[in-house]
Amino acid sequence: MELIVSPEPALKIERRAKLLSVTFARPAENNTLTQQTLNELSRAFDDAERDPACRIVLLEGSGGYFCTGMDFREMTSRSTHDQRSTGDIHYMDLLRRIATTGLVVISAVDGQVMAGGIGIVAASDLVLATPASRFSLPEALWGLLPACVLPLLIRRIGFQNSYRMTLTTETMTARQSLEAGLVDELADSLDDAVRRRSLRLTRLDQETVRRMKAYFQKMWYLSDATYETAVNEIEPLVRDPRIQENIRNFVEHKRFPWEKIG
């Protein structure tokens, strides 16, 4: 008889009164986003939205990492002939859900946020961060673009700030991120900041928040076509043999594209 071992959960989920705490729980892997992680996030939002008492979803990291984007090991295992990357579609669906759900989504950041993690932060309703937190979009170093991140990031911090992050791939401090509008509040104690914000936010019902988000989205350029454009832009890049090789060399040898072999 073959023993089937279930994978360890990618998320730690805890209910606190009217708040659902969702913690990225793969710090040894820098809290990257795997298909398993995306599936668990989808189920967590399903459960929270079905609960009429729930008002807030709190997203947190662990081990010095909030979230560092798509998992490179999983990405390199995809066939270059895949017609559509399921992971990219599910990631885009996650960002859309955060931006439209009737729940208030708070990202509480204590550590590093990179790549797709920036998209989660940008889509969130409120972003709280400790002074030690850092934010970056390093995709261009491997020949990729943060295509799925940018619609939400531009909405939050504007065109030039988003373009600068994408072009330079430089890391922004928590203070710089606050000044750019990516972070809403710096706090030494995230627990205290969340508790203070929750006192008023838990008084809003889900339908009010849903209508609020829907109306604000009408005031911006986000649409089904925008999201589709983002996914269509990233798909040929993740299938490109050159980019696949760049990522594979980094995964297997910790070698960046500009570093020559031997």
List the model feature ranges, each with a label.
Residues 95-142, 171:
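Glycine-rich beta-to-alpha active-site loop
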Residues 150-160:
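Hydrophobic, secondary-structure "cap" segments at the distal end of domains
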Residues 61-97:
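Glycine- (often His-adjacent) and acidic-residue-rich active-site loop
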Residues 128-133, 183-228, 258-262:
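C-terminal long alpha-helix characteristic of the crotonase
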Residues 1-7, 248-262:
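Terminal low-complexity tails and localization/encapsulation signals of metabolic enzymes
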Residues 1-62, 199:
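Conserved CoA-thioester-binding segment of acyl-CoA-metabolizing enzymes
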Residues 126, 164, 168-170, 185:
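Well-ordered beta-strand positions
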